[in-house]
Amino acid sequence: IPNIFNQNEISAEIKKNLLNELNLEFNFEKKLHYKFFPRPHFITNELSIIFNDNKISEIKKIKIYVSLNNLFSLKKMKVKDIIIENGNFNLNKNNYNFFIKLLDSNFKDIKFEILNSNIFYRNLQNEVLFVNNIINANYIYDLNESKNILYSKNKIFNLPYSIELFTDKEKKILNSKINLESLRLQIENQFLDGEEFNSGLSRFNFLNLKSIAEYKSNKNYFEFKLFDEAQNSKFSYNGKLNFRPFHSYLYGSANELNFSHLFSNNAIIKQLLKTEILNNTNVDFELNITANKIKNFDNFTNIFLNSKIQEGLIDLD
């Protein structure tokens, strides 16, 4: 049984397996313990992951399941499944693509799972911009589609959502499907990583109302156009999110504004207020919308809506 082997040899062989199969460099700070039930695996506490020569995570616990047939030979032992629990991942603009790059790993014979963990998105001054809670994330290989897929349940700003992520290597496109059930919003996205700037196309389904967004971004900004999918477009919006300094705006026009979608019992505004996302002092947002009329309010015409959110305060004209 593996207990007869030298601890350093076990650690080195498992690290080698993880690096070869997943291109992940692990640093084990404590001893690896072998468990036979419910199936053969190693377990340890206090470890980290090295990415681009920098430590990006601190992990409380990991389980590494290994092949049973080769347990008596370290050289033939193969890692089968990995479960990370209670990990903290620190990402910034230099390593933001860590979870995306994992999709290039070999998941044909290995399943990779992350439970009850957090992603801290930081600026280069190491200040936390926001935190994404990972409830359950799974990297698997889909035999029918012949591709790696990430399925993940998360929460951000107290807003639960799920995401499905996969890549098209030939077209160099990252595909994602996001479901925000509490907002009744689904988003399908295609993202192309270009040399000068990134671009993409998103399709939104909100309360069975379908719309399309085209966008592009670089290290300084994120810019988009949003319009409905109908042949005769009823609305069109332009927006931009500047990162230096952090500021965003949304300008647009619509034939008719329907406030029932915004303020009903299950509306998006009410759900956003519950999450307290608008209280975040990092949110700096400006809104300017024009419309011909308001639905069910015929006396209101030629509408101009102006709003600003800054340092947790909402100003509405």
Report each predicted region and the residues it spans.
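Elongated, acidic membrane-bridging lipid-handling scaffolds
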Residues: 87-196, 201-208, 266-315
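A short, sequence-level motif marking secondary-structure junctions
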Residues: 33, 62-65, 127, 166-171, ...
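Short, surface-exposed beta-strand-loop junctions and turns on beta-sheet-rich folds
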Residues: 50, 127, 229-230
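Flexible beta-edge/linker motif
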Residues: 3-7, 11, 32-124, 140, ...
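Strand-loop-strand
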Residues: 195-198, 202-241, 316-317
